[in-house]
A protein has these predicted regions:
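Conserved positions within tetratricopeptide repeat
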Residues: 229, 249, 253, 268-275
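Nucleotide-sugar donor-binding/catalytic module of glycosyltransferases
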Residues: 1-233, 237, 338-346
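Flexible helix-coil transition and linker loops at the boundaries of alpha-helical arrays
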Residues: 240-249
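Helix-capping and short linker residues that terminate individual alpha-solenoid repeat units
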Residues: 30, 240, 283-284
Length: 350
């Protein structure tokens, strides 16, 4: 019998986009599937909208608001699949994503091989999705994957992964103590527990950049900064458990330097710990530098003013792009239908 795949979808205040995400899940060409939606205490109509899809293979649960990790764990505990596909409630799967990954995994003997796939980001129009290849888009060993992620500041979007139940049970549940980068920590742990990553170029993920993504913005939240720091230490621990070498130490220091601006200078406690850890790894962290357009503000108005200005204009640029795409999306869809465009032809879109 062919393996059963469980598509686990955590959702919080997702009524605007969950229809398209569920359509992409239902449209999967792999027939042996179940879809588990976990409404994490939404205050909008997320649960009501999701229940329109309820069927023998689509089950919707509602829970108190406990966060992403708890919602995913709730879904995994109740699913029956041999493989688990996590899908955020505003992202889309290409129709044959799961089928292509399972075809690739059927050619290997171990259930500890982890499947990944290409991903790209879009705002409203999927045909304008940008797929930007990086060095993670290939077959890699666990240590090579973590080295590149941490040493080159790369990542793979959550839905790219297809995880066997055996591998998920070995890696353990999502960490419910983390409030930021809980997905990054979890999949780093899954990678460490795996016997390798099989990259499947035919399957695609469409990652929506929307207002809901602002939940992942760390800002000035000390809870999120504490969580990020814990996740970073775990990343370093996972990589060093696989290999202790000069290249690993260098990648770990680079990784800390990448995220250093989130703590400097407002969290001197974390800054001091990071410097101590960098010294242990035979490295040193330097004060963050700004883009040349903002660096001149630092000696005149101070570090915080430069940081605030850079963050403001970066956010403004992204907001203007999103609003423009929204306007074009409304213009293109208004003459035909008020129903969101079907996602079944995503495979043909670039």
């Amino acid at each position: 019998m062919k393996p059963l795949v469980s598509i686990v979808m955590p959702a919080f205040n997702a009524e605007q986009w969950i229809v398209e995400s569920l359509q992409s899940a239902v449209a999967q060409t792999w027939e042996r599937k179940e879809i588990i939606v976990v409404d994490d205490g939404s205050t909008d109509r997320t649960a009501e909208v999701a229940r329109r899809f309820a069927s023998k293979n689509v089950v919707v649960f509602s829970t108190d608001n406990r966060g992403l990790s708890a919602a995913v764990n709730y879904g995994i505990q109740r699913c029956q699949g041999d493989y688990i596909q996590e899908l955020d409630s505003d992202d889309l799967l290409a129709p044959d994503k799961i089928e292509k990954q399972l075809e690739a995994l059927s050619k290997v003997d171990s259930k500890r091989i982890l499947a990944s796939s290409p991903w790209g980001h879009f705002y409203y129009r999927t045909r304008h999705t940008r797929f930007i290849q990086n060095s993670l888009w290939q077959n890699l060993s666990p240590v090579e994957w973590l080295l590149r992620k941490m040493g080159e500041d790369l990542h793979m979007q959550n839905a790219t992964w297809l995880v066997s139940r055996e591998l998920a049970e070995t890696a353990g549940p999502w960490n419910e103590d983390l409030q930021y980068d809980q997905d990054g920590e979890y999949f780093a742990r899954v990678v460490r527990a795996s016997e390798g990553i099989r990259f499947v170029p035919e399957g695609r993920i469409y990652y929506r950049v929307s207002g809901s993504n602002q939940l992942s913005y760390i800002g000035s939240s000390n809870r999120k900064k504490d969580s990020l720091f814990r996740s970073m230490k775990l990343h370093i621990q996972y990589l060093r458990s696989l290999e202790e070498s000069d290249r690993v130490r260098k990648a770990c220091v680079t990784y800390m330097q990448t995220w250093y601006p989130h703590f400097y200078p407002d969290r001197p406690d974390i800054v001091a710990e990071l410097q101590d850890l960098a010294a242990e790894l035979q490295g040193h962290l330097t004060p963050p530098r700004f883009d040349w357009k903002y660096e001149w503000l630092k000696p005149v108005f101070g570090w915080r003013a430069a940081a605030t200005t850079e963050r403001f204009f970066s956010g403004l640029k992204a907001s203007l792009r999103r609003r423009w795409d929204n306007a074009m999306y409304r213009l293109e869809t208004r003459p035909t239908s008020l129903v969101p465009p079907a996602v079944v032809n995503l495979k043909q879109r670039d």
